[in-house]
Amino acid sequence: MRLASKPTKGRTLDYAAPVYDLLEPLCLLSRQAEYDAAVFSALNPQPADRILDLGCGTGAQTQQVSLVLNPQLGGAITGIDAAGAMITAAREKRGSDRCFFEVMAAEKLDFPDRSFDAVMSSLFFHHIPLDLKRASLSEAYRVLKPGGTLVVADMDRPTTFMGGLVSHASRWLFFQPQIAENIRGVLPELMSEAGFTQPERLQHFFGYITVFRCRKEETR
């Protein structure tokens, strides 16, 4: 039975759930494995970590991270997405005793303060408008433990001609004005506004996707 989606101003991809596992690798062409490895390395998950994945889609990357977690030590990852069809598919394909999925909007997380050791997000923030970007990062900060890590991989200010061409074309082709905010390079500023340390730009892909990492300071 398909789960109901959560109301949100962000763009949900219920319609894409049946083919999402086929489409995502096409978007990253031949660099899917390299991209996944870069996100994993930035996150550096430990066996006892509790991790949150924002905008997890059908949970392929969520599941990859879960493989190093040990539920006997309390290790687990929870993927959230506002699209009920995505979470339905994720639970059916990839749910386990260390990999959980919930229908939830990133701007309104149903978790207590300081619940997670790390928060990750892959190609999610370009689907939501500026106010939800800001709210989602504030929520990520709230649910992170002091010293916790935030890893965001998403569209960023283009660094090459081709990157600029693809990112601007995507904005108009997919009718997503939210992409323009990413292209302007707003994500690092929004992370800092939310209270995180200065974001590091760890790796770039295709001239317009960046893997960011920042932290919640130990004293907060």
Question: Which residues does each predicted region cover?
Answer:
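C-terminal alpha-helical "lid/dimerization" subdomain adjacent to the S-adenosyl-L-methionine
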Residues: 4-7, 151-194, 198-211
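Short glycine-centered segments of the SAM/dcSAM-binding site in methyltransferase folds
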Residues: 50, 147-149
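Class I SAM-dependent methyltransferase SAM/SAH-binding core
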Residues: 52-108
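A short SAM/SAH-binding and catalytic strip from SAM-dependent methyltransferases
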Residues: 118-131
